Amino acid sequence: MNSNLLNTPIDYLKGLGASRSQIIKKELNIFDYKDLANFFPKRYLDKSKYYKIKDLPKFSCDVQIIGEISNITEIGLGRKKRLVAYFFDGEDEIELIWFKSIKWLKKSLTLNTKYIIFGKLSFFANKVSIPHPELELFKSENLKLRAKLQPIYPSTETLIKKGVSNKVISNLVKILLFEIKIKFKETIPDYLINELKLLDKNSAIYNVHFPENNELLSESIRRLKFEELLFLQLQLLKKNIYRKDKIKGYNFNIVGNNFNKFYNEVLSFELTNAQKKVLKEIRNDLGSKAQMNRLLQGDVGSGKTIIAFMTILIALDNGYQTCLMAPTEILSVQHYEGFLLMAKLLNINIVLLTGSTKDSIKKAIYKSLESGEVDIIIGTHSLIQDKVKFKNLGLAIIDEQHKFGVAQRSKLWAKSTTPPHILIMTATPIPRTLAMSAYGDLDISLIDELPPGRREITTVHRYDNNRLSVFAFIRDQINEGRQVYVVYPLIEESKNMDFKDLMDGYESLSREFEQPKYQISIVHGKMKAQDKEFEMKRFENEETQILIATTVIEVGVNIPNASVMIIESSERFGLSQLHQLRGRVGRGIHKSYCILMSGSKLSNESKLRIKTMTETNNGFLIAEKDLEIRGPGDIMGTQQSGVITLKIADLISDQEILIYARKCAKKILTDDKDLLNSKNSKLLKTYNHISKNKDLWSYIG
């Protein structure tokens, strides 16, 4: 069957009609036969079981009954009007109730005619009924068909209102598969199908819509999920191979004076085994003559920054400049100040460039950067401006890169004739499956060990009506010489109200902790950069005991004496944000605490987030739970979500299939990196199609 048939517009499907066709196109993005065939059910109903009314369960669930309508009556007036039919199975009776389409139903339903009804039991005022049941005229030949699993397709409110029911969609797919009998070209080679005992493509498509049995359904879903994840991994791994083969990088083969002096004379502690392992991986990349593209992951406080600095020293020892780009000015300043202390000991020239840098200083930086006098530049997105020119940029480090767009990162990479080595750092732990998908084209290093002596933070949840006891705890901590963060949410959609909450909180704390005994700093987005920096400095120098802030302190702030993090309206933060904020304390020798404040009314999702925070300090466990709650698109944001748009596979529930698909993709490309072997011809055709069209499911051979 040729591919033109699969490209046939759905308008030509028997019984669809122009009006419904337009609605389906608009609501479901189904435009042609292949789109409809690849519109997979979201779940299945088992309609093989029939109940007698006397044996119905005593709880709300789906049931199916065979019987006759013995009586029909209208009850109530206006909005309370409803149609009630009494359904008799030969022994007992149950009420069927409809609140909509009453006139049409009254004409359509026939007394003393045998029907099969299907619906959810409802219990109200000691009476059991079935609201809005599905009805079908009883035909003995239909019993065999109904014994199979029934597909339930994704829908929308508009579709339901316009009469495009699940039954309509299901019937359209039936016409497509059993009357028109469309066929798909196979995408997976025979040797893989045989080796992995996979169903062929067409059997999988047919059985995912209308499974013969549970076993075939499982095999069909497994086949289609594996296919989707295999081609995702082939794309990502081939991209990685291409970079290593074709994109040559600077060869940093010297470990010289800067690195050795720092390691032997300046570094005052032993690196963890995890840090040593990661440093070795980076050094291997830098000496491979290919461009490094590595993601460095590590939980809060795991020691990523020191690894970044040591990587910079290798670049400097080989005669190249480096840059570090961070998403916020506060984080840029923190990196600069931390690096400056170490750089001075090594006589390294380091500068800071942000939006608030004075014009005269900017001009001097531009000049010395282009001449090669500057060794390291740290900054925000200011680094990607056209005015910023390097003499020989050899290494670019990007911190919290998910907060930058692709275009911003590309501009940074373009500042060198030979692509600089790229090290991406994140303190936002990324679940393994998400890392394999969103960052599957990068090499990944993981610091999965905290330095010795790092103490766990005690996290508790307190309701707003416990505020006085929380104030008492803050006072005790301050009297012991500690400092306290109090963080408020600031969300764009409600920023005016959030700003008011922040200022109300400041006034409340000012009344409770009066001057001159207590000093309070406040930092928020409406302040000028220099004012923020001034208040942060006061807190860092222990001139103030309490810092009230919005999430501008989410990453990068390092105050070892701060031992308490109070997060107001904690139910409004995501898990990742809560974990990052908690990571601002516990950086010194003192026992530290995180207190999650909230109102008394919490959604189930909020309760789950708060419970997770109180039960673990492990950022990777938290990331897995966050993925489970929010899904991959929300976690990565719109800039990243495109790479993980999946039609049938799921990054949360299909981890085993994803890991296996990546393993298979690696083996295939190890043996045949360009997919030129004749046995991989199907893979190559499909891969080329995806590369061009960005969509596996539009491939029809």
Predicted regions: what is each one?
Residues 537-547, 553-560, 565-568, 583, ...:
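Accessory helical-bundle/CTD segments and flexible terminal tails appended to RecA-like ATPase motors
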Residues 280, 291-611, 621:
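Inter-lobe coupling/hinge segments of SF2-like helicase ATPases
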Residues 22-23, 249-296:
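Conserved pre-motif I regulatory segment
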Residues 132, 140, 395, 411-413, ...:
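N-terminal cationic and glycine-rich segments that engage phosphates or anionic surfaces
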Residues 75-266:
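Upstream accessory/linker segments immediately N-terminal to the RecA-like ATPase cores of bacterial MutS
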Residues 68, 120-121, 235, 570, ...:
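Short, surface-exposed secondary-structure boundary micro-motifs
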Residues 39-66, 70:
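OB-fold nucleic-acid-binding modules
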